[in-house]
Amino acid sequence: MGGSALNQGVLEGDDAPGQSLYERLSQRMLDISGDRGVLKDVIREGAGDLVAPDASVLVKYSGYLEHMDRPFDSNYFRKTPRLMKLGEDITLWGMELGLLSMRRGELARFLFKPNYAYGTLGCPPLIPPNTTVLFEIELLDFLDCAESDKFCALSAEQQDQFPLQKVLKVAATEREFGNYLFRQNRFYDAKVRYKRALLLLRRRSAPPEEQHLVEAAKLPVLLNLSFTYLKLDRPTIALCYGEQALIIDQKNAKALFRCGQACLLLTEYQKARDFLVRAQKEQPFNHDINNELKKLASCYRDYVDKEKEMWHRMFAPCGDGSTAGES
């Protein structure tokens, strides 16, 4: 998103004497505030639901002053944008309103009048007083965590009053939140979200004909927990969650792989080999599984060599020619 593209391409053919760049641009934009304080032009359509009022959003944005090629504010150069909660983390009222009009994957251009941006005073020296600003915003994703927070605060009895689909939806949101935190390397926080999802699914009583839906939702959460505990250097707990996943699907290659990784860290080499060979049987050409088997072989060779050296030292003759145990 560059200012050069904005200034050169957006307004071609729309020149009008005496009108500024933003005035000409505003003529083709949609009024979403009701007073033309926030105007919108969709560059790329999104899909799915609109952003919920209490959602946490993952966005990329760049803010421009009129006739400036470079943004005065942008997070486009960050590898991973920060998750921001509506009503708390977003300081521009215009951006808040704009996001509420967007769907996942949407890219849009907005004009914010001063009362929806930096006010009559601006933000010296960067933003002059009474300045209209342009923002290009891409909505990567959003999580309606407020709904799940409220649901998780209910008692088990209250949660049972809701249909199963509601529980599955909330659990999926918790898992998505955990996945985001995991990608940020915030493993402890991710673990908390995964555990919340698992608790919801475990305490949900479902009729036999719907139990398979609960088990299907549990499986990826258990796999996430196993991987997260490996990242937290807690292989015993990682193994526990991996084995729980295998109860649901005994041939699941990812669960077998996680169990093998955990056993290798615990130096339980035979168990590690058993799990990894079973995983390889399910996915013979999986690069990660095959590499882990090579790593296991190397670790086991080192272990055997160290054992031999230890026993050799224990039974080696003493320096004066006497053997261990001689008086």
UniProtKB/Swiss-Prot annotation:
A GO-annotated cellular component: cytoplasm
Single biological process term from Gene Ontology: transposable element silencing by piRNA-mediated DNA methylation
PROSITE patterns noted in UniProt: FKBP_PPIASE, TPR_REGION
PPIase FKBP-type domain: residues covered: 54-143
Protein keywords: Cytoplasm, Differentiation, Disease variant, Meiosis, Nucleus, Repeat, RNA-mediated gene silencing, Spermatogenesis, TPR repeat, Williams-Beuren syndrome
GO molecular-function term, one example from the UniProt record: identical protein binding
Protein localization: Cytoplasm; Nucleus
TPR repeat start and end residues: 171-204, 219-252, 253-286
Tissue specificity note: Detected in all tissues examined, with higher expression in testis, heart, skeletal muscle, liver, and kidney.
Keyword Chaperone assigned: no
SMART domains assigned: TPR
Disease cited in the entry: FKBP6 is located in the Williams-Beuren syndrome (WBS) critical region. WBS results from a hemizygous deletion of several genes on chromosome 7q11.23, thought to arise as a consequence of unequal crossing over between highly homologous low-copy repeat sequences flanking the deleted region. Haploinsufficiency of FKBP6 may be the cause of certain cardiovascular and musculo-skeletal abnormalities observed in the disease. A father and son with Williams-Beuren syndrome appear to have a common heterozygous deletion that includes FKBP6 gene. Spermatogenic failure 77: An autosomal recessive male infertility disorder characterized by oligozoospermia or azoospermia, and abnormally shaped spermatozoa in the semen of affected individuals. Sperm abnormalities include double and triple tails, with amorphous or fragmented and enlarged heads, as well as pinhead sperm. Testicular tissue shows arrest at the round spermatid stage.
Function according to Swiss-Prot or TrEMBL: Has an essential role in spermatogenesis. It is required to repress transposable elements and prevent their mobilization, which is essential for the germline integrity. Acts via the piRNA metabolic process, which mediates the repression of transposable elements during meiosis by forming complexes composed of piRNAs and Piwi proteins and govern the methylation and subsequent repression of transposons. Acts as a co-chaperone via its interaction with HSP90 and is required for the piRNA amplification process, the secondary piRNA biogenesis.
PANTHER family for the chain: INACTIVE PEPTIDYL-PROLYL CIS-TRANS ISOMERASE FKBP6
Subunit and interaction comment: Interacts (via TPR repeats) with HSP90. Interacts with HSP72/HSPA2 and CLTC. Interacts with GAPDH; leading to inhibit GAPDH catalytic activity.
Recorded family membership: Belongs to the FKBP6 family.
Listed name of the protein: Inactive peptidyl-prolyl cis-trans isomerase FKBP6
Annotated source species: Homo sapiens
Gene encoding the protein: FKBP6
